[in-house]
Design a protein with these regions (language model features):
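Conserved catalytic-core motifs of GNAT/GCN5-like acyltransferases
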Residues: 6-7, 32, 76-77, 89-108
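Short cationic/low-complexity microdomains
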Residues: 18, 69-88
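Small side chains
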Residues: 25-27, 43, 57, 73
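Residue-level recognition of the GNAT/N-acetyltransferase active site
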Residues: 41, 45, 78
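Short phosphate-binding/catalytic loops that engage adenosine nucleotides
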Residues: 53, 70, 93
Length: 113
């Protein structure tokens, strides 16, 4: 079972541990917070890679951010990081820009009314 646990020192310090069966499996740091949009970085422990950890953890992050009234996630991924590009596409992200250094993708969490 995958879960995320807030480890920030305050409600605005958006850092999370990723736990798999109560064992540390990685971390997520939310940055570039510009409501209603945010960006994040995710790192999965080497021994936990290719086991679906990020695929299970990111929707949990998105639910947490929706509770905080965020509506859009934006990520920048190195073009050679094909695993992350595939993961984010599978989660519904759309490519919005690309240059030699990064592919920028975004996901709308809540449709504006």
């Amino acid at each position: 079972m995958i879960e995320i646990r807030h480890i920030g020192k305050s409600a605005d310090d958006l850092r999370f541990f990723i736990l798999s069966d109560r064992q540390h499996a990685g971390g997520i740091t939310v940055h570039s917070v510009n409501p209603p949009q945010f960006s994040y970085g995710i790192a999965v422990a080497r021994e936990m890679r290719c086991k679906g950890v990020a695929k299970a953890a990111l929707p949990l992050l998105f639910e947490e951010m929706k509770r905080r009234s965020f509506t859009k996630a934006v990520v920048q991924i190195a073009p050679e990081n094909t695993a992350s590009l595939k993961l984010h596409a599978a989660l519904g992200f759309e490519r919005i820009a690309q240059d030699a250094h990064a592919v920028t993708m975004q996901l709308t969490l809540v449709r504006p009314s």
